[in-house]
From Swiss-Prot:
Keyword tags: Cell cycle, Cell division, Periplasm, Signal
Protein's recorded name: Tol-Pal system protein TolB
Oligomer status and interactors: The Tol-Pal system is composed of five core proteins: the inner membrane proteins TolA, TolQ and TolR, the periplasmic protein TolB and the outer membrane protein Pal. They form a network linking the inner and outer membranes and the peptidoglycan layer.
Predominant location: periplasm
GO cellular component, one term: periplasmic space
Source organism per UniProt: Rhodopseudomonas palustris (strain ATCC BAA-98 / CGA009)
Pfam family, one: PD40
Recorded name of the encoding gene: tolB
Intracellular or extracellular location(s): Periplasm
GO biological process, one term: cell division
Phylogenetic lineage: Bacteria, Pseudomonadati, Pseudomonadota, Alphaproteobacteria, Hyphomicrobiales
Described purpose of this protein according to its UniProt entry: Part of the Tol-Pal system, which plays a role in outer membrane invagination during cell division and is important for maintaining outer membrane integrity.
Keyword Signal annotated: yes
Length: 444
């Protein structure tokens, strides 16, 4: 099987941008508006996204799809309020002609996106877009892309990221993917397969056949490889799966069982938990030399390690103090410091790509909650709670988390997203039950 992410299929031309870099409800010191991302409530920015114009019916269909994907991406972020196309007073037919800004202002649009799809002689698609500040009439951004027609959704995600960054001042997260565990069948005979999809739930593909149980997939920093656990021949082993070639290999041959693998930020090492003599300790393996270094040596269960973005520290789960808590220590080993002190137990810690938060699962009072805290343990915040929420993973920009929720009984788990302020909880569509998500870095 071959699963090519086709990064090389996408060629981006030089950008043509003019005017401001930000737009939103509140004007800045230069008279330009900006979406203010804060920890409190956010007033979503009204934005108009007409269908991209095109010269042929088939290209027009793709143009409509591109505008719909952009609309859905921005709406799901919680920072934008796309205006219903039925309210539009102007029909965009030529993106080279400035829009009638008064018509867009009259429907309360503060930003406007126009675009065009053009079929090239070699069969490729040329996609162009313009981002406008309706109040000032300034073009904030513009770019053109060339790609094979089958990758039009990729174009839509990249344009969404461009818009998000121009209007918020922060990197987007739409041109990314999620690896997860697809689950099917009755609860007592559940089949679990490794699956890959776009961050919005589209383009699902299955990487394993479901003959063996798979768990805890994680991306490499390059997006090319996935590490995961598989229960083959009765014991869990850690594997590497190459997304582009479909090939896989066992990561070492360890005595006992191995759990919770995760890449280092430079992609050169894998950190994991190995069970030996009834205890589980943390080990790191150099992927080139295959040399393994032990990081912890305690009569406890140390598991679920996660690197800080700069690779200098790790956070992990340990019951060395009685019940599971979160600890931090140098990535090379050494003294571990406990950072979780609330009621209940803490598990599945993961460091934000920004380095500002550690997300976790917290169990207590019959509830499983998803929360975040600062790396020093301060500022603990519960984002969502319920019967069984677990497995947080950060978007590439660190502003959104994905997790899975299992209602119990005969039903199965589903994926959800929530932002770091606890707002905008949304279900992520998947073909079946889904658990153990892991968000990739940006693809571009």
């Amino acid at each position: 099987m071959s699963f090519d992410l086709n990064r090389r299929q996408l060629m981006i031309s030089a950008a043509t941008a003019a005017g401001a870099l930000a737009l939103g409800p509140a004007r800045d010191a230069f008279g330009q508006a900006r979406v203010q991302i804060t920890e409190g409530n956010v007033a979503p920015l009204p934005i108009a996204i007409p269908n991209f114009v095109a010269g042929t019916p088939s290209d027009a269909e793709v143009g409509t799809g591109v505008s719909q994907v952009i609309t859905n991406n921005l709406k799901r972020s919680g920072l934008f309020a796309p205006i219903d196309q039925a309210a539009y007073l102007e029909k965009i037919t030529n993106i080279d002609v400035p829009p009638q800004f008064k018509s867009w202002a009259s429907i309360n649009a503060q930003a406007l996106v126009t675009g065009r799809m053009t079929r090239q002689g070699d069969g490729r698609l040329k996609a162009e877009f313009r981002l406008w500040d309706v109040a000032t009439g300034q073009q904030l951004a513009g770019q053109q892309y060339f790609t094979s027609p089958e990758y039009w959704r990729r174009i839509a995600h990249i344009i969404s990221d461009q818009i998000y960054e121009r209007l918020t001042g922060e990197k987007g997260y739409f041109d990314s993917r999620v690896v997860f565990i697809d689950e099917s069948g009755p609860a007592d005979r559940r089949v679990k397969r490794l699956a890959l999809m776009d961050q919005d739930g589209a383009n699902v593909r299955y990487l394993t056949r479901g003959s063996d149980l798979v768990l805890t997939p994680r991306f490499s920093p390059t997006n090319q490889e996935i590490t995961y656990m598989e229960f083959g021949q009765g014991e869990p082993r850690v594997y590497l799966f190459n997304v582009e070639t479909g090939q896989r290999e066992i990561v070492g041959n360890f005595p006992g069982m191995s759990f919770a693998p995760r890449f280092s930020p430079d992609g050169q090492r894998i950190i994991m938990s190995l069970q030996q003599g009834g205890n589980s300790n943390l080990f790191v393996m150099d992927l080139r030399s295959k040399a393994t270094t032990r990081l912890t040596d305690t009569p406890a269960i140390d598991t679920s390690p996660s690197y800080a973005p700069d690779g200098s520290r790790i956070c992990f789960e340990s019951d060395r103090g009685g019940k599971p808590q979160i600890y931090i220590m140098p990535a090379s080993g050494g003294q571990a410091q406990r950072i979780s002190f609330g009621d209940g137990s803490y598990s599945t810690p993961v460091w934000s790509p920004r380095g500002d938060y550690i997300a976790f699962t917290k169990q207590g009072g019959g509830q499983f909650a998803i929360g975040i805290m600062k790396p020093d343990g301060s500022g603990e915040r519960i984002l969502t709670s319920g019967f069984h929420n677990e497995g947080p993973t950060f978007a590439p920009n660190g502003r959104v988390l994905m997790f899975f929720r299992d209602p119990g009984g005969n039903a199965g788990p589903s994926l959800f997203t929530v932002d770091v302020s606890g707002r905008n909880e949304l279900r992520v569509p998947t073909p079946g039950y889904a658990s153990d998500p892991a968000w990739s870095p940006l693809l571009s």
